[in-house]
Amino acid sequence: MAKAVDKKFCWEIKNFSSLNSERCHSVPVVIGDCKWRLVAFPKGYKADYLSLYLEVADFKSLPSGWRRYVKFRACIVNQLSQELSVQQETQRWFDQNAPGWGFENMLLLTELNAKDGGFLVNGQVMIVAEVEFLEVIGTLDESEEIIKSSDLINKTQEVAQQVKEIIQPNDLINKTQEVAQQVKESIDVNGFQVLPSQVESVRRIFKKHPDIAVGFQVKNQHLRKTFMNFLVNVIETMCQSLQELSNEDLVEVDIALTYLKDAGFKVDWLEKKLDHVKEKKEKEQSGLIILQGIEQQLHELMHKCEKKKSEVLSVGAPLKFDDVV
């Protein structure tokens, strides 16, 4: 296991073309208080792309409730031209339920394995990863402190219960005031308290899909408001341009729609829209790859053109007097 330098580490996958395993992983490196490793699917994961993920290798040894909000940048190095290297970046929460995350469509396998493409040289693929912590919750040191203080917590439980009985009425008053303030700042639309800025959007949703919340049985107004806000945010995410939407964003939208559907919302129409957006995203990515190839060819042709132009000008130059005599 090697220590990462400046939050970056390099993974050289040798004999890439002869790998028979479905997945392979790098040697773990230490960044912060965790061991991280890259996981690759050389034959693709449900697609014709090289899939690449970042994973917490020692997540089972971390304390319960641990979370790491990480900026993850991965680059498939083009060993012939640095400018043609493929890079993707994301920011994600890693936790006990999701210790790994990454890019399902990192690079087309046909482009990766292309002869003289620059990504596969002498049977080797080179990947550079960068991991940056944005927020850390639950460290090993905190876990030890919790264990040491458990006896004190047990001894004070009886007193805490007595205090709780005194505080509860005040908490109830504060909570009631908080809910009342939220309701005051909200507007009712079809039984949902929504922010003034979302009123028009929610009304349009119910106008086009009046049965969207028929199966949603939650009565608590705070939860109803949260779910509706969640739905509006999902739709607003899908309204972003393809350049702003990453493949990971689309995966998150897919998960969010499943969550809403499980809660009782009818979102089949949104699922169809999502499929359409995914198709457009795939076409965009394929088009960009083709465009990149055309631009490279154009660059080479322009270079040849300039060279030939110089030759023609040189040949067409008039003879000097001394050249004739």
From Swiss-Prot:
Keywords: Coiled coil
Organism domain of life: Eukaryota
A Pfam family of this chain: MATH_2
Residue ranges of domain MATH in the record: 6-131
Keyword Glycoprotein: no
SMART domains referenced in this protein's UniProt entry, alphabetically: MATH
Coiled coil: 266-315
Protein name, per record: MATH domain and coiled-coil domain-containing protein At3g58340
